């Protein structure tokens, strides 16, 4: 477990550590996943690392190796195993890392990626101590080389370039024009299914994860999507807890819906019933109703007020986007 001394003031800053312009903002572009992305796996030879590295290889992702200090010098899935991320980058030119290691050492694995200055680190691990992630948040905000997705997330995938870094089921994805950002893994797949079914497809799908200190949040993804030439519409999937969706609504009001031709945005917010259970954590560490603005109804209303098409069931996301495309045509 990582140790750091963190004040209450630092805690407040880190919960929203990339709202102001800081060096870390420069790494948002690292989320794009071009075809030449070279991926390594931390925890490469473990059961989950092996399983998902193999699926990514079959999908078309360029997996160039991985790390396991105890097996450095060996070959796994036809690729070399290295002692460290730094060694892997030096030998393979890796530009992204998928982190599949147990919770007690996951923050240390993220720290290693940051120190090695790999452009993109995607941490799938659930159950990382929040104090450890607060330490990582402080590291991230002072550097401009590494972008983190997660932890506790399904990962990130670009169907057009066939770059998959995570645990997503590849068969449901279709290259297209909708950018998806989600706090929930299963809701992500429902949104993907909806956009595939309506033939809208996906440009980039980011699972930000449900923990309290995500490396990439809604506004980071929205900044990327609004400037990305391959993205023409957005799906935002939120849930109870925190005020990230409220902040995203204000961002969309200022930077999207004020445009002469806004980008269509649809959203689903999970946890309507949970709003009656204040102070109770619902699954994710960040999914807890703490007061005004953190419940599902407040978030849905904030999004509706700025022009987002908010649906009551994820099964309506595809049609909601089609309606928005017609509206803004």
UniProtKB/Swiss-Prot annotation:
Keywords: Ligase, Mitochondrion, Nucleotide-binding, Transit peptide, Tricarboxylic acid cycle. Its EC number is 6.2.1.5. Residues 1-24 form a transit peptide. The active site is at 284 (tele-phosphohistidine intermediate). GO terms for molecular function: nucleotide binding; succinate-CoA ligase (ADP-forming) activity; succinate-CoA ligase (GDP-forming) activity. CoA binds at residues 45-48, 71, 124-126. Pathway: Carbohydrate metabolism; tricarboxylic acid cycle; succinate from succinyl-CoA (ligase route): step 1/1. It holds the Pfam family CoA_binding. Induction: Induced during growth on nonfermentable carbon sources and repressed during growth on glucose. GO terms for biological process: succinyl-CoA catabolic process; succinyl-CoA metabolic process; tricarboxylic acid cycle. It comes from the Eukaryota. SMART domains: CoA_binding. NCBIfam families: PRK05678.1. Present with 18400 molecules/cell in log phase SD medium. Heterodimer of an alpha and a beta subunit. Succinyl-CoA synthetase functions in the citric acid cycle (TCA), coupling the hydrolysis of succinyl-CoA to the synthesis of ATP and thus represents the only step of substrate-level phosphorylation in the TCA. The alpha subunit of the enzyme binds the substrates coenzyme A and phosphate, while succinate binding and nucleotide specificity is provided by the beta subunit. This is Succinate--CoA ligase [ADP-forming] subunit alpha, mitochondrial. It comes from Saccharomyces cerevisiae (strain ATCC 204508 / S288c). The gene is LSC1.
């Amino acid at each position: 477990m990582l140790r750091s001394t963190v004040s209450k003031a630092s805690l407040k800053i880190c919960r929203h550590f990339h709202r102001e312009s800081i060096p870390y903002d420069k790494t948002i572009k690292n989320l794009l996943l071009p075809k030449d992305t070279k991926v390594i796996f931390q925890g490469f030879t473990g059961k989950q690392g092996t399983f998902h590295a193999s699926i990514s290889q079959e999908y078309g992702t360029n997996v160039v190796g991985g790390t396991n200090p105890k097996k450095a010098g060996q070959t796994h899935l036809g690729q070399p195993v290295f002692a460290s991320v730094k060694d892997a980058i030096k030998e393979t030119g890796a530009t992204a890392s998928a982190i599949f290691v147990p919770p007690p050492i996951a923050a240390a694995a993220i720290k290693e990626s940051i120190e090695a200055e790999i452009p993109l680190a995607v941490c799938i691990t659930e159950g990382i101590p929040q104090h450890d992630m607060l330490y990582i948040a402080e590291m991230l905000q002072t550097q401009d080389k590494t972008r983190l997705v997660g932890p506790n997330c399904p990962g990130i995938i670009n169907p057009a370039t066939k770059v998959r870094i995570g645990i997503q089921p590849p068969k449901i994805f279709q290259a297209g024009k909708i950018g998806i950002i989600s706090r929930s893994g299963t809701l992500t797949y429902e949104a993907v299914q909806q956009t595939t079914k309506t033939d809208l497809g996906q440009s980039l799908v980011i699972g930000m994860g449900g923990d309290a200190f995500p490396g990439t949040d809604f506004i980071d993804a929205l900044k990327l999507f609004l400037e990305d030439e391959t993205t023409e519409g957005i799906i935002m999937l939120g849930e109870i807890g925190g005020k990230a969706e409220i902040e995203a609504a204000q961002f969309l009001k200022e930077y999207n819906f004020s445009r002469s031709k806004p980008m269509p945005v649809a959203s689903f917010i999970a946890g309507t019933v949970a709003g009656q259970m204040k102070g109770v954590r619902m699954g994710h560490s960040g999914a807890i109703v703490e007061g005004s603005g953190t419940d599902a109804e407040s978030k849905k209303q904030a999004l509706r007020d700025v022009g987002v098409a908010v649906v009551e069931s994820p099964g309506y996301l595809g049609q909601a986007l089609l309606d928005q495309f017609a509206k803004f045509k």
